[in-house]
Amino acid sequence: MIDIKAQYDIPTMRRIQNIHFIGIGGVGMCGIAEVLHNQGYQVSGSDLKASSTTDRLEELGIKIYLGHLEENVYNAHVIVVSTAINEQNPEIIWGKEHRIPIVRRAEMLAELMRYRHGIAVAGTHGKTTTTSLMASILAATGEAPTFVIGGRLTSAGANAQLGSSAYLVAEADESDASFLHLQPQTVIVTNIDEDHMDTYDGDFEKVKHTFIEFVHNLPFYGLAVLCVDDENVREILPTLSRPVLTYGIDQEADFYATEIVQTGRYCEFLAHRPEGEPLKIRLPMPGRHNVLNALATIAVATDLGVDASAIQAGLMGFEGVGRRFQEQKPLALPNGSNVMFVDDYGHHPSEVLATIKAIRAGWPEKRLVMVYQPHRYTRTRDLYEDFVRVLSQVDVLLLLDVYSAGEAPINGADSRSLCGSIRQRGNVDPIHVGSEADLRSILSNVLREGDLLITQGAGDIGMVSKNLSVSGI
């Protein structure tokens, strides 16, 4: 077993010193850039426009270029790109012409993992929260792990940190299958669901086979921690030839939860382990889906030999992660009263449903008012009926226009079509919202004392939420 208090000296990447990131403001890029900067590399990056992320990186001493120009990479020894970057980008073109190595972000993440005990968290849903919980538990041992997370960890004020221990905890991104570049020693698979189907030619069997390949990237002495409550994870389980521990509400799992009680945003439960007394857990996050996320980290921590007290403290002391059921200050209404206000990143029907269930369990007396922004026309098209079914379960629904993420509009996969289909279902009469100004006006008429307002989605609705929190309605 690796000593979790070991001070790790990481070998350098030999002749590589200057590392340039194209699209450095992206959530998957900025964290890797920050860790490399803190390791002593000369890091630079370019993006189309300034953001709070690029501003923060600049404050750390990372050179930021606004716009993509070939001169940005004249001094680069390696160029890091995400799949969102077009091959016609002038920085990529110049790099190829001058034989500069161009690597995907997952390849660079794999390099960060190479000399550490990598813990990679995969799954269609719950990656960011589970990765954050894992980092919190390891930090509770007294030695900070390195982590790269797809959201801002409240306790650290960042989505990445260079730690002092042997461990690196990171999300493993299946959206472009780039997680196959990673070679961790421990993996978590939270679930497998239909999403990013364009990557897999619309074939869900390919999705499942890719997860199997990901698990088999483990060394023979590695460990896969899998959620058996998920039917697709259960399906791949017999095909795996690596050591496995399972978790779930299902009591046939190696690690399972009983006596689950949710009060407001807190969940309490007993975590049963193969050996030893059950752990009494108090988790400051609502919903059974977060109980599952916590169980995954309990399984990994137990395997690593983390003390029960550190597991309990790491979970109880978890301060949350940005846009994952993030409570804002109460929103003031024109009549002087206020409503509970939450912002959440979930943008897949399964994620939205989990959030709705968590709210119903924790605040059953409140009327649920959701402002939802669909993310991508392809996702809206592919999961259209699921969106109709799930969004019909709120009390008041306001639908913003689809956040395209660069996609061309698809007929019948827009917000007005979604409104019509939800209205036909008969449970709720949705309101289409054309602008942020319209949203403020509608909310001032719709909201009433005792409501719970949630802004939901992965596009720029996070900024809408921030503006509402700052300026009110």
From Swiss-Prot:
It is an enzyme of class 6 (ligase). It comes from the Bacteria. Its EC number is 6.3.2.8. ATP binds at residues 123-129. InterPro entries: Mur-like_cat_sf, Mur_ligase_C, Mur_ligase_C_dom_sf, Mur_ligase_cen, Mur_ligase_N, MurCDEF_pg_biosynth, UDP-N-AcMur_Ala_ligase_MurC. GO terms for biological process: cell division; cell wall organization; peptidoglycan biosynthetic process; regulation of cell shape. It is found in: Cytoplasm. Its main location: cytoplasm. Pathway: Cell wall biogenesis; peptidoglycan biosynthesis. Keywords: ATP-binding, Cell cycle, Cell division, Cell shape, Cell wall biogenesis/degradation, Cytoplasm, Ligase, Nucleotide-binding, Peptidoglycan synthesis. Gene3D superfamilies: Mur ligase, C-terminal domain, Mur-like, catalytic domain, NAD(P)-binding Rossmann-like Domain. It holds the Pfam family Mur_ligase. One of its GO terms (cellular component) is cytoplasm. SUPFAM superfamilies: MurCD N-terminal domain (SSF51984), MurD-like peptide ligases, catalytic domain (SSF53623), MurD-like peptide ligases, peptide-binding domain (SSF53244). Belongs to the MurCDEF family. Cell wall formation. This is UDP-N-acetylmuramate--L-alanine ligase.
